């Protein structure tokens, strides 16, 4: 778009950008009027604005007559001629001619398109004209044939001359109309486009036929005798009129498509047939050239071969010798089959192509129903209650339109009589009365300056509608009315002819005028239309032939297989894949993959739950066996261990499937297996660890004191206010019932006390008693016996224990280590049920060094470190005693309170104590023991 910043004295051209403030000052206060086209409506309505008063830049849409200041009248006159002009999206008029020329251009283009379709794309009655032209051409051909017969030469020549005159006129007019009507196509517009159209093959044929006809007629009329030879040659050119019958070239396109589709088969047949022709002709020529003069040359043999193999058989040349006849018969049988192949290939190709075209036409019939169905679906969707579409209701607002106020002023009484019953009812409604009142009040809302200047100028400007609150800020909810915006000066305004539509619609009708019941009715109608369109579309989907049925069946079968496969994939994702492989290696690989990757399917989860349930069942069975065997011991052991409370087993969270038999203590089992230690850490529970070894009741078991106990023990500072606890080994029972041996050692742990108990005395350190150890050589195992002594006895024992610990530290003596040893031939390890052994079957050995003790235990029981027995205290009341925790492996101790009662070891059956004779011992009473 050209842009030019004009001053006050310059004349504005079409499409100029002008600064209205400066232009108004230079022109003596004249104001610019800007016409803005309603692009969406496509009509000649102009919206006026008063931007000139604000000093904004305006786009002038006038012609050269549009000027500044005093040229406002020229602008008005030019804009009056622009009433019907269409505007582009950039605000530029699409047509610069008057409305009459626009209408003429529309008619011109319409006629041009119509004639082009009649001549190039005939439909309906247009075939009548083409049939007439065909009869003319065919009649001309017949007369040309009769003109060569001597008996009919005179009559045929005279009729042919008249017919050729008619043909020249018809073909000449048709050729000119074809060239002119081709301008409706974009590629054929202009003189270059016309030349491009004239170079088409059929236009070239028309030109040749027209020139030949003119030459023949001119030669006949002049009676030139020397032009007879030329006329005979031009007659052939007139035969080309038959070629132009198929203007669109559908026949040639069909033939070309068939030949192209079967080109390989045709080339193969023609190639083999040509080889047979060459060989047969040459062999017959060699045999017949001496005996038969008809085959004197190879060309004569080729002629004979062609006529014979094409099954024509003129009979002008025939072989005479028997050898030549045998060769011709053999090659005829072979060659005729290949020469006949192209005819069959082309015939089948034409049949298939015709059938395909029929199917294509059948499928093309589905386009309109499919488009109608899509349209109905969209309209039904857009009319939904939750839809925010505005445009979908606009087609239904036409029924609410009323005539413009201008037409009502011309004759309201006469127009009311011509109104239909529906319009009278609508106008009688409250909505119609409000529309009437708004239309009547248009003149009252006009500005005074407009009324004053309306008398002196031919134009008349109105103010815009004063919309109500509903549609004032919602212009998209109302129809685009043709009301202009107010302009202060009437000199730059446009006439009322630009203000109103061609239809004169002047009503303010919005989407909100459609009441909910009306919208509901519209939705119902659209739903019914949708169902009707769907039914019609289904009717067009009926199969055309058996091939379509097979294709539909195969497509449906393929879709079903895809859906089944998708369903199976989803089921496998939910339930897991239950693959059963015959190969062992592949099965192992699959199991390894399942172990490495977490299977989140339902099958994997079920398997995981089953494994965990089996592990829990095995653990519970083991614990129940232990509990039963402990209760079956003697009276003393029963009294001592009957108070053990075995709660339900609590599975470790770090391992999902490992049983207590397979669990390993990775923290320190490799170095500290079979050793007693005093743990003093404040974060981990305290406990006494007993290491159970695989043994039999008849075999001798040796317990060795490991020196690692001394190095791993941790001293606890003891204050005077704290209590003390003494742990010593003691034998419990001499008699034990025989019980089955467990497969692996078991870990038994007593949980620590609650941290809520704070002010309790601390225990004493663990010290061995050599005398007690000698007396307890024949004991089965060790247990804890709680003694109720006073504070003085506990303090005296604490002092002695301190001195003994110092002596152990100085001399490097070992602490007590309970390391059972049995021969290696035992296949199973003993459980807790073998904790109590008879004194006659067990011997305790004291190892002098750490290496000997640990080496002996490792030699006899290399796998013993995998299982341990932990006994810890559970909750105790404020008046009950609490036990310290002793571990064979180094474990940190939790902060806990200890009871004032001390613990010491003793024998339950013999009631003999390893400690001092004056100390009073009680039976083992551990009311809160928990397996963990």
UniProtKB/Swiss-Prot annotation:
Pfam families: Ion_trans, KCNQ_channel. The keyword Membrane applies. One of its GO terms (cellular component) is presynaptic membrane. Residues 370-378, 521-528 are annotated as: Interaction with CALM. Residues 299-319 dip into the membrane without crossing it. Strongly expressed in brain and skeletal muscle. In brain, expressed in cerebral cortex, occipital pole, frontal lobe and temporal lobe. Lower levels in hippocampus and putamen. Low to undetectable levels in medulla, cerebellum and thalamus. GO terms for biological process: potassium ion transmembrane transport. It is found in: Cell membrane. Changing residue 244 to C: In a colorectal cancer sample; somatic mutation. Keywords: Cell membrane, Disease variant, Intellectual disability, Ion channel, Ion transport, Membrane, Phosphoprotein, Potassium, Potassium channel, Potassium transport, Transmembrane, Transmembrane helix, Transport, Voltage-gated channel. It is linked to Intellectual developmental disorder, autosomal dominant 46: A disorder characterized by significantly below average general intellectual functioning associated with impairments in adaptive behavior and manifested during the developmental period. MRD46 patients manifest developmental delay and mild to moderate intellectual disability. This is Potassium voltage-gated channel subfamily KQT member 5. The gene is KCNQ5.
């Amino acid at each position: 778009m050209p842009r030019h910043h004009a001053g006050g004295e310059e004349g504005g051209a079409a499409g100029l950008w002008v600064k209205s403030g400066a232009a108004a000052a230079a022109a003596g206060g004249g104001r610019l009027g800007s016409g803005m086209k309603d692009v969406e409506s496509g009509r000649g309505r102009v919206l006026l604005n008063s931007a000139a008063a604000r000093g904004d830049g305006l786009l002038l849409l006038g012609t050269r007559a549009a000027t500044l200041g005093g040229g406002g009248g020229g602008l008005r006159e030019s804009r009056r001629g622009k009433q019907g002009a269409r505007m582009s999206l950039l605000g530029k008029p699409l047509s610069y001619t008057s409305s009459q020329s626009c209408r003429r251009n529309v008619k011109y283009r319409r006629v041009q398109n119509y004639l082009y379709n009649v001549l190039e794309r005939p439909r309906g009655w247009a075939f009548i004209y083409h049939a007439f032209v065909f009869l003319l051409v065919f009649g001309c051909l017949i007369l040309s044939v009769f003109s060569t017969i001597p008996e009919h030469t005179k009559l045929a020549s005279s009729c042919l001359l008249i017919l050729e005159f008619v043909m020249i006129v018809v073909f000449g007019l048709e050729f000119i109309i074809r060239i002119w009507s081709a301008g409706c196509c974009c590629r054929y517009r202009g003189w270059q486009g016309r030349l491009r159209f004239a170079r088409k093959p059929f236009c070239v044929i028309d030109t040749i036929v027209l020139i030949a006809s003119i030459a023949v007629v001119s030669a006949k009329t002049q009676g030139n005798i020397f032009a007879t030879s030329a006329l005979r040659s031009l007659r052939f050119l007139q035969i080309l009129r038959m070629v132009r019958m198929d203007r669109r070239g559908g026949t040639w396109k069909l033939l070309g498509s068939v030949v192209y589709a079967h080109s390989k088969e045709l080339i193969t047949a023609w190639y083999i047939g040509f080889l047979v022709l060459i060989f047969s002709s040459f062999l017959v020529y060699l045999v017949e050239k001496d005996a038969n003069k008809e085959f004197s040359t190879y060309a004569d043999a080729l002629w004979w071969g062609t006529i014979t193999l094409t099954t024509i058989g003129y009979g002008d040349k025939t072989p005479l010798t028997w050898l030549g006849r045998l060769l011709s018969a053999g090659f005829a049988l072979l060659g005729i089959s290949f020469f006949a192949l192209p005819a069959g290939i082309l015939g089948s190709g034409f049949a298939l192509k015709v059938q395909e075209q029929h199917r294509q036409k059948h499928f093309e019939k589905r386009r309109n129903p499919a488009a109608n169905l899509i349209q109905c679906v969209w309209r039904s969707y857009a009319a939904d209650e939750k839809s925010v579409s505005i445009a979908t209701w606009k087609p239904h607002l036409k029924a609410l339109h009323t005539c413009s106020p201008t037409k009502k002023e011309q004759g309201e009484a006469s127009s009311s009589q011509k109104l239909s019953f529906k319009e009278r009812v609508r106008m009688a409604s409250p909505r119609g009365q409000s529309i009437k009142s708004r239309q009547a009040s248009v003149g009252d809302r006009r500005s005074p300056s407009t009324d004053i200047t309306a008398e002196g100028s031919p134009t008349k400007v109105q103010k815009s509608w004063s919309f109500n609150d509903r549609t004032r800020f919602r212009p998209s909810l109302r129809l685009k009315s043709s009301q202009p915006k107010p302009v202060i000066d009437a000199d730059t305004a446009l006439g009322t002819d630009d203000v109103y539509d061609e239809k004169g619609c002047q009503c303010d009708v919005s989407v909100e005028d459609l009441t909910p019941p009306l919208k509901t009715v519209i939705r119902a109608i659209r739903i019914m239309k949708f169902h009707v369109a769907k039914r019609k579309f289904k009717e067009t989907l009926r199969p055309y032939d058996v091939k379509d049925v097979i294709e539909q069946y195969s497509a449906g079968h393929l879709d079903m297989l895809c859906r089944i496969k998708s369903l199976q994939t989803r089921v496998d994702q939910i339930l897991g894949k239950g693959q059963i492989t015959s190969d062992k290696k592949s099965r192992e690989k699959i199991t390894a993959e399942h172990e490495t990757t977490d299977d989140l399917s339902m099958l994997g989860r079920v398997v995981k739950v089953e494994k965990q349930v089996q592990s829990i069942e095995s653990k519970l069975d083991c614990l129940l066996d232990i509990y039963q065997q402990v209760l079956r011991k003697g009276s003393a052991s029963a009294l001592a261990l009957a108070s053990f409370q075995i709660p339900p087993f609590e599975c470790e969270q770090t391992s999902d499937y490992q049983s207590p038999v397979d669990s390993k203590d990775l923290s320190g089992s490799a170095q500290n297996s079979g050793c007693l230690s005093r743990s003093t850490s404040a974060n981990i529970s305290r406990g006494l660890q007993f290491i159970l070894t695989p043994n039999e009741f008849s075999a001798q078991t040796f317990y060795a004191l490991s020196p690692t106990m001394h190095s791993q023990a941790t001293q606890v500072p003891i204050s005077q206010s704290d209590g003390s606890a003494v742990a010593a080994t003691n034998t419990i029972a001499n008699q034990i019932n025989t019980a089955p041996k467990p497969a692996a050692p078991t870990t038994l742990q007593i949980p620590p006390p609650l941290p809520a108990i704070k002010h309790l005395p601390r225990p004493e350190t663990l010290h061995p008693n050599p005398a007690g150890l000698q007396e307890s050589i024949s004991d089965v195992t060790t247990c804890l016996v709680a003694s109720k002594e006073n504070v003085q006895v506990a303090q005296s024992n604490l002092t002695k224990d301190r001195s003994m610990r110092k002596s152990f530290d100085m001399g490097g003596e070992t602490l007590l280590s309970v390391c059972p040893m049995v021969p290696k031939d035992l296949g199973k390890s003993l459980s807790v049920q073998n904790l109590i052994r008879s004194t006659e079957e067990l011997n305790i050995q004291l190892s002098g060094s750490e290496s000997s003790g640990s080496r002996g235990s490792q030699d006899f029981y290399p796998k013993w470190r995998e299982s341990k027995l932990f006994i810890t205290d559970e909750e105790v009341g404020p008046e009950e005693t609490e036990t310290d925790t002793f571990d064979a492996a180094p474990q940190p101790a939790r902060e806990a309170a200890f009871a004032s009662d001390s613990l010491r070891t003793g024998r339950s059956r013999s009631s003999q104590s390893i400690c001092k004779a004056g100390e009073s011992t009680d039976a083992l009473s551990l009311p809160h023991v928990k397996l963990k």
